[in-house]
Design a protein with these regions (language model features):
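Acidic/polar N-terminal loop/beta-strand segments that form early-domain functional surfaces
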Residues: 3-5, 15-16, 51-53, 80-82
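A C-terminal junction/extension of Radical SAM enzymes
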Residues: 154, 160-163, 167-206
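A short, flexible beta-alpha/helix-coil linker loop
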Residues: 17-21, 108-110, 174-178
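A generic structural signal for secondary-structure junctions
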Residues: 15-18, 98, 117-121, 198, ...
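Radical SAM/AdoMet-radical enzyme domain recognition
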Residues: 27-50, 57-169
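Canonical Radical SAM [4Fe-4S] cluster-binding loop centered on the CxxxCxxC motif
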Residues: 1-30
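Short acidic, glycine/proline-rich loop/turn micro-motifs
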Residues: 22-23, 113-115, 180-181
Length: 206
């Protein structure tokens, strides 16, 4: 993770305001991360995934990724992003050899996107998605499934894979209330998600 900051405010991840993010002295510099990855590469690590927060809110991320791809022994540098500021960087990602990008996208409905993220960035995300498909970079969608929020999107995301060269991964919502007396169990775990998919696609092979 290159930052804990994000330009969206997804309700299941963080409050809408009053956040206290880490200051610069509390996170690794790019130089420190390059040194760390170089050491790990010498030990046999060959793949690196960039995450956040939202990685692209950190200044000079793309030059940093170019440095990562140049490290001997690193065969793949991938990134997970919300896609809001991705489109303009795709040509450079392509030129440096980035082969896979994951976009975090919980709904295909613009109004519902605003309800979930509390930001009006749906058009920007979809523009990034289309540009990514056009670039030939392997594209994946990560969708967190939540009761009463985006169940209709499960089948919609599946239909997307029929027309677009994209992989979709459905993710269980992670509870943030620990495992004590106040623990709220996950209402849509992987088994329930899979069963819901099979209702519409009975010939699905797991």
């Amino acid at each position: 993770a290159v930052t804990d900051r994000c330009n969206l405010r997804c309700f299941y991840c963080m409050p809408e305001e009053g956040l206290q993010f880490s200051n610069r002295s509390q996170i690794l510099s790019y130089e420190e991360m390059i040194r760390l990855v170089s050491i790990l590469a010498e030990l046999g690590i060959s793949k690196v995934r960039i995450t956040g927060g939202e990685p692209f809110v950190r200044k000079d991320l793309v030059p940093f990724m170019e440095q990562l791809t140049a490290i001997s022994g690193i065969d793949a540098v991938n990134i997970t992003t919300n896609g809001t500021d991705l489109a303009r960087h795709i040509p450079r990602l392509k030129s440096m050899g980035i082969k896979s990008v994951n976009i975090s996208l919980d709904t295909l409905d613009k109004a519902n996107f605003f309800k979930i993220t509390r930001r009006d960035e749906f058009d920007e995300v979809m523009n990034s998605y289309r540009a990514l498909l056009g670039s030939g970079i392997d594209t994946k969608i990560n969708a967190v499934i939540m009761e009463e929020h985006n169940l209709d999107d499960i089948h919609g995301m599946c239909e997307l894979t029929k027309t677009d060269p994209v992989s979709v991964r459905f993710i269980e919502e992670m509870p943030f209330n620990g495992g004590g007396k106040g623990y709220t169990p996950i209402s849509w775990n992987k088994d329930r998600i899979l069963a819901h998919i099979k209702e519409a696609y009975p010939n699905l092979i797991k």
